[in-house]
């Protein structure tokens, strides 16, 4: 007697969903491509459905990275990652950054066993379930996103600040917050990237900040050679710059 466990069923569903999504992309050659932001303050929700010319599945992008499906149009191409259970992790994001591979991720993780080709095809054209992983057009923007730290916020009469700011100075009340260049609020700091008040992601409001890497020109980062980073803290980083120099930072624990 053949007994199939729940784990086997889940794996089978995952495999079928993943394969169906790739086949639909290969057949239709269409996918929604998000707008490529130029800066952290570029909040446009625009994007568009693009029709490509050909597709290639499971293509090796490097010795360690394989794309789910690549779409081609002339000399341009787009790598598509299908998320069923696992999203593109930090290690792969860095690989894609270093290789300069334009990549999007299609999120199918909420779709269970009752899916149809029509449901998947619709999802592939919907902005709400597709995120931009990397675009070489705005490399500086993505370098900041990879190297930024999520920091908890605190509020006082001077505004909203991160706790334990890496650029902090002690004020008269011995409260740590950034006063870089005379600016005394995170929103006005050069190291501020973005604000997140989504309690489904974090328990409290957070800032994405790169103050720990103050002085590095993000626009000249060629490759991220090493990054030791936990959820909210960078411990060490090694960067190859455009002029061939290497910048290393060991950040205190």
Task: Annotate the PLM regions.
Residues 1-27:
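N-terminal cysteine/histidine-rich coordination modules
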Residues 25-32, 112-117:
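A short, charged
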Residues 7-13, 88-90, 197:
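Short amphipathic alpha-helical segments with coiled-coil-like heptad repeat character
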Residues 9, 13, 41, 189:
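Functionally engaged cysteine thiol sites
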Residues 102-104, 109-253:
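Non-catalytic C-terminal interaction segments of nucleic acid-processing enzymes
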Residues 68-69, 94, 179:
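Short, flexible, glycine/charge-rich loop motifs used to bind or transfer phosphoryl groups or to couple energy/partner
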Residues 77-119:
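Basic, amphipathic alpha-helical patches used to engage nucleic acids or provide basic targeting signals
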Residues 33-83:
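Active-site metal-binding core of divalent-cation-utilizing nuclease and nuclease-like domains
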């Amino acid at each position: 007697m053949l007994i199939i466990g729940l784990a086997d069923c889940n794996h089978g569903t995952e495999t079928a969903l993943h394969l169906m999504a790739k086949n639909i992309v290969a057949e239709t050659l269409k996918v929604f491509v998000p707008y490529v932001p130029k800066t952290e303050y570029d909040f446009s929700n625009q994007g568009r459905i693009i029709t490509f010319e050909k597709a290639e599945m499971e293509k090796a992008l490097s010795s360690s990275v394989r794309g789910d499906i690549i779409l081609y149009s002339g000399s341009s191409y787009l790598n598509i990652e299908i998320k069923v259970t696992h999203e593109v992790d930090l290690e792969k994001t860095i690989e894609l950054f270093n290789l300069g591979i334009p990549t999007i991720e299609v999120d199918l993780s909420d779709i269970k066993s009752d899916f149809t080709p029509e449901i998947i095809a619709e999802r592939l054209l919907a902005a709400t379930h597709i995120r931009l992983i990397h675009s070489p057009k705005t490399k500086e923007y993505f370098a900041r996103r990879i190297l930024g730290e999520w920091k908890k916020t605190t509020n006082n009469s001077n505004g909203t600040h991160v706790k334990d700011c890496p650029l902090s100075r002690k004020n008269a009340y011995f409260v740590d917050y950034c006063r870089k260049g005379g600016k005394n609020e995170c929103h006005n700091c050069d190291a501020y990237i973005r604000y997140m008040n989504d309690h489904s992601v974090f328990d409290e409001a957070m800032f994405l900040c790169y103050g720990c890497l103050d002085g590095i020109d993000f626009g000249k980062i060629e490759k991220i050679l090493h990054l030791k980073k936990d959820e909210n803290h960078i411990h060490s980083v090694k960067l190859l710059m455009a002029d061939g120099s290497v910048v290393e930072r060991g950040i205190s624990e």
